[in-house]
Amino acid sequence: MAKDIKFNLDARDLLKKGVDELADAVKVTLGPKGRNVIIDKKFGAPQITKDGVTVAKEIELSDHFQNMGAQLVKEVASKTNDNAGDGTTTATVLAQSIINVGMKNVAAGANPMDLKRGIDKAVAKVVESLKKQSRAVGDDFGKIENVAKISANGDETIGSLIAEAMKKVKKEGVITIEESKGIETYVDVVEGMQFDRGYISSYFVTNTDKMEADLENPYILIHDKKISVLKDILPILEKTIQTGRPMLIIAEDIESEALATLVVNRLRGSLKVCAVKAPGFGDRRKEMLEDIAVLTGGVVISEEKGLKLEGVTIDMLGTAEKVTISKDNTVIVNGAGEKSAISARVSQIKTQIEKTTSDYDSEKLQERLAKLAGGVAVLYVGAPSEVEMKEKKDRVDDALSATRAAIEEGTVPGGGVAYVRAISILEGFKGINEDETTGIEIVKRAIEEPLRQIVENAGKEGAVIAQRVKEEKDDFGYNARTGIYEDLYVAGVIDPTKVARVALENAASIAGMLLTTECVITEVKEENPAPAMPPMGGGGMM
């Protein structure tokens, strides 16, 4: 395959065009008055979004060289989204500014490597300033609501719903986003431990209106293998019948003979019982069964521990205040496990989360932690049309990520003001040579850009408002939503520190790589020859 090679100014100019194409499409979404972008889809209705990373991911340019520039800035948005969950548009705006001003300086003869060193030094200083400006969120649900609202483009409903969900499940809890079946957006909190396995037979149902089995104060038998024959569980069933309490059996599976006997006993009313399959698979199943055992104060009956079903005693069974089993889910409320044992299990899972390198494992461990320590809140997103619902779901997702980032590293004044306040830390800061100092100046100019862009998207003059904000101090800034200058912290216009930090670090990293590029290589497009004409038929005339 032949290659096309470009050098120096030619290469950088084409890369810059690609950067501008992508950044110009993304930056219109920034701020409370940012606009929507409509993305054509091969199947179904077009997608409407205000999510920067969603726009960036859709862009592929026909020119190979320009496309490389676009893909590099797409990487800025994607990495920022992966690390902080929000701030993708801000990162794109910062990258575009650093690249544009940087390339002008390279064209004027500045050394690209020195520029990059200056940029890196300035970014480290700005990050230091952001950390100084940062204020912890703690349990201030007002701040959590404000962060979520800003990230959801000023949607107060989303802000209050996320704050409500956080309040209910605490920091250790898990909040998931689902599509609502109606047009309402609401939060549903599952108290206690829920796992996605329902009753094995509908004959176990006690509430026929809801098709659920409700067990009050039941004993819970936890077994990690199949229960095939009745004689294995007969001793413990007889002991449970004597107590008069219901029983929940959690096992890998319950086969026909044992299941038929349980159903008959249930229908006769001699034993209120329900059987469900164990959640998870493989090693994860063992861990989840141990979690249930710790939560309910029971023991996992496992041959690995030398325990057999026929030898089970009442004190090996777990208990809970209530268990509700539907066709697909089981919820255990107020398990009788000891607080100290649950705390120890929670600490163990937290340690595993810190050590794991897999995103999937981390997510699953986080879910287990939530089920033990906090709870699970489901945020159901509804809208009149599917197109609007998907757009809203994108904003809810951003808001949730921003909220988690705020809890992690605190908050700074929003509206681009935190970056503007960081300019003072760069005043008088010099590099070891003129080009390094130019790199510092490039960052100094770039960190004004998010504020300017927010203002431009609100239909005002960016340069004028940026100058006014620079003249003031602390949290004073321009609220683009209301169109007035005010204390942004008091007005609730705040951003997560982590989002501001990660956006700048990623933007500077990719911009630095682009500025130090001297040669670009791409494949030559092959001209596909037109297919040969099919032979003409004689039409029967010879």
UniProtKB/Swiss-Prot annotation:
EC number: 5.6.1.7
Pfam families reported in the protein's UniProt record: Cpn60_TCP1
GO molecular function terms attached to this record: ATP binding; ATP-dependent protein folding chaperone; isomerase activity; unfolded protein binding
PROSITE patterns: CHAPERONINS_CPN60
Ligand binding (ATP): 29-32, 50, 86-90, 415, 495
InterPro entries found in the cross-reference section: Chaperonin_Cpn60_CS, Cpn60/GroEL, Cpn60/GroEL/TCP-1, GroEL-like_apical_dom_sf, GROEL-like_equatorial_sf, TCP-1-like_intermed_sf
A GO CC term assigned to this protein in UniProt: cytoplasm
Name of the protein described by the UniProt record: Chaperonin GroEL
Name of encoding gene: groEL
